[in-house]
């Protein structure tokens, strides 16, 4: 019984990751004809690393119901620790 529950949890966790948004590069963004642009998202938070900022963009993309995102800006403008990130999102 315990192994069945464990197996079910593993399947659910793996399937949840397959629904995550996919980051695409410049070339892919220009050549995707079968997607609909949903606009641009902006995030200004105190992140320790660029990967944390990318994770936040991914989560916001998911929250907006988009499938793909293309990072258009990621920078730390001053010494205040806030990282500014923005991305085009697509469905």
Curated annotation (Swiss-Prot):
SUPFAM superfamilies xref list: YdgH-like
Signal peptide extent: 1-20
InterPro entries: BhsA/McbA_stress_biofilm_assoc (IPR051096), Dodecin-like (IPR025543), YdgH-like_sf (IPR036275), YdgH/BhsA/McbA-like_dom (IPR010854)
GO terms classed as biological process: response to stress
UniProt GO cellular component terms: periplasmic space
Endoplasmic reticulum is among the record's keywords: no
Pfam families named among the record's database cross-references: YdgH_BhsA-like
Cell location: Periplasm
Entry keywords, A to Z: Periplasm, Signal
Family: Belongs to the BhsA/McbA family.
Descriptive protein name: Uncharacterized protein YjfY
């Amino acid at each position: 019984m315990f192994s069945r529950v464990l197996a079910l949890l593993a399947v659910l966790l793996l399937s949840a990751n397959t629904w995550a948004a996919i980051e695409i590069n410049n070339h892919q963004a220009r050549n995707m004809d079968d997607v609909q642009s949903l606009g641009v998202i902006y995030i200004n938070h105190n992140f320790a690393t660029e990967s944390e900022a990318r994770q936040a963009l991914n989560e916001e993309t998911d929250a907006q119901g988009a499938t793909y995102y293309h990072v258009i800006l990621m920078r730390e403008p001053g010494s205040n620790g806030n990282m500014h990130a923005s991305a085009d999102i697509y469905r």
